[in-house]
Structures are given as structure tokens and as C-alpha cells.
Design a protein with these regions (language model features):
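Structured beta-strand/loop patches that form or line metal/cofactor-binding pockets in enzymes
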Residues: 1-50
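Glycine-rich anion/phosphate-binding loops
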Residues: 23, 88-96, 132-137
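Conserved, mostly hydrophobic/aromatic
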Residues: 31, 37, 95, 108, ...
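Metal- or metallocofactor-binding catalytic centers and their adjacent structured scaffolds
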Residues: 33-35, 39-106
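Residue-level marker for buried hydrophobic side chains located in beta-strands
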Residues: 40, 183-185, 234-235
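Generic detector of well-ordered alpha-helical packing
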Residues: 44, 97, 102, 187, ...
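Metal-dependent enolase-superfamily TIM-barrel catalytic cores that perform enediolate-based chemistry
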Residues: 113-230
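Catalytic alpha/beta core domains of metabolic enzymes, predominantly
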Residues: 218-252
Length: 252
């Protein structure tokens, strides 16, 4: 059994601005896991709110976890242990994916089939970051032209406030009129409860599919208020790091 780590810088086609800042590229960590003549690969993307803000930090976290002894444990047992040890989710994702990729290759099966998924392809989306209406007008065609993309995720939660969010969104609606795409919104925790209530109603009137992470991680109590009388389905992202986080959201 052996591991190796490889840092790769991925340049973004366009800068991605969200409520917490702007990213121009991402230095991700690829994990290579070899055992019994088979090789599995996994990838970890660092994040400041995910417990490992650089590829080097991901590598350090994973080396420390591996050093605790992982031989003889199932993938699920290792996942549970990582959760109990509060291992950074973005770091452990690289190791977990490498294990599953290795298992699929050993079984001579596509990973999707090993996991019980029948479809070889699934619809995906592209994302447009927080921008001025002028930038949105030019960028939407560049993102959608000549693709089979079915959904556009729109980053809101602008530091300039909800009026800036509305202006951007209105331009997105205008710029997507000639494309058959659904619109989703991700605020990345950029709103408070009052702003989220207002924006969810406003966005629902404009046929948005759902809202993702309206409130900051750590402000989950406010989700109960949003859930009551909600105008849109609510998805959580930053608030849900491991599978054991899911039951807390079951009541709403």
C-alpha cells in the first residue's frame, strides 16, 4: 500500500467571486493510492472555511491521518474515524475518492456502477460569480453558447447588498432568455435571516429552482425561521460537512 501526493494549479476561465471573496485559480491536491497492482486517484480542493486553505495543508492533514494506521479498515470505518477526528472534509474527500476509485478498478467496474448508479451521464450546471450587470451581459453567452448545460448557478450575497444582487439577477434573466436553462442561486452565507426571507420571495417570483446556503455556517438556527413559510426549497452546503451532519436538518 502506498500513497503519493501531487499538487496541480487549475486556472479558472473567469475569476469566481462569491460572498467571501474572489478566486482566480485553485491549487488542488491529487492523491494516488496504490495497492495490489491497482491505482486509485482522488482530488481535494482547499477552502478557507473547510479546515484546509491550501494544498499543502491538505497534504499535511492526510499524512497525519494515514500515520494513525489505516490498514485493515473498511472505507466506511475510515470515513467514520475521519469524522470523529474532525479531519478537514475537503482534505478527506481526496482520500475517500482515491479509496473508492481503487475499489472500482479492482472490481473492474466503473465507479458509478460500483456505487449503484445506472446512468453514465448526469446533467450538470455552470456557475457565474458575483458581477456587475455589464459583466453578466457579456459573460452569460460565453458560459452557455455551444454547450448542453441545463442549469446556471448564480452566486449572490454581494458585499454591496441585496439591491446589487437584484440588479445582477435581473441581467442574468435577460441574458438567458434565448437559452433553455434553469436558474439556481447560491448565496454562500451572504445574507442574514431578514435579507434571505426577502430574497427568497423575490427570487421565487422569478422562477428560481432553489436557494443554496442563504445563511452563514454557524447560523443554522435561522434556517428554521426560513423554512417556515419558505418561498423556495433550501439547500445547505457549508453547513453540512459530513454525513452525520444531515440528521440535524431532518425536521426542516
Amino acid at each position: 500500500m502506498g500513497f503519493s501526493f501531487h499538487k496541480v494549479t487549475l486556472k479558472k476561465r473567469f475569476p469566481l467571486a462569491i460572498s467571501r471573496g474572489v478566486r482566480y485559480d485553485s491549487e488542488n491536491l491529487f492523491v494516488r493510492y496504490e495497492k495490489d497492482g491497482y491505482v486509485g486517484w482522488g482530488e481535494g480542493a482547499p477552502g478557507e472555511t473547510e479546515g484546509a486553505s491550501t494544498a499543502d495543508e491538505i497534504q499535511t492533514v492526510l499524512k497525519q491521518f494515514i500515520a494513525t494506521g489505516i490498514e485493515g479498515f473498511s472505507i466506511q470505518e475510515l470515513y467514520d474515524r475521519a469524522s470523529e477526528m474532525r479531519i478537514s472534509p475537503c482534505a478527506y474527500a481526496a482520500l475517500d475518492t482515491a479509496f473508492w476509485d481503487w475499489k472500482a478498478k479492482k472490481a473492474n467496474l466503473p465507479l458509478r456502477q460500483l456505487l449503484g448508479f445506472s446512468r453514465p451521464h448526469t446533467p450538470t450546471s455552470v456557475t457565474i460569480g458575483i458581477n456587475s450587470p455589464e459583466v453578466v451581459k457579456n459573460r452569460v453567452p460565453l458560459l452557455l453558447e455551444g454547450t448542453t448545460v441545463q442549469s446556471l448557478k448564480i452566486k449572490l450575497g454581494s458585499p454591496q447588498g441585496i439591491e446589487a444582487d437584484k440588479a445582477m439577477f435581473e441581467q442574468v434573466v435577460e441574458s438567458t432568455k434565448t437559452y433553455d436553462v434553469k436558474l439556481r442561486v447560491d448565496a454562500n452565507g451572504g445574507w442574514d435571516v431578514s435579507q434571505a426571507q426577502h430574497m427568497m420571495k423575490w427570487l421565487a417570483e422569478r422562477k428560481v429552482d432553489y436557494i443554496e446556503q442563504p445563511l452563514k455556517e454557524g447560523e443554522e438556527d435561522g434556517l428554521k425561521t426560513l423554512y417556515n413559510g419558505r418561498a423556495l426549497p433550501i439547500y445547505v452546503d457549508e453547513s453540512c460537512r459530513f454525513s452525520h451532519n444531515i440528521p440535524a436538518f431532518a425536521p426542516y
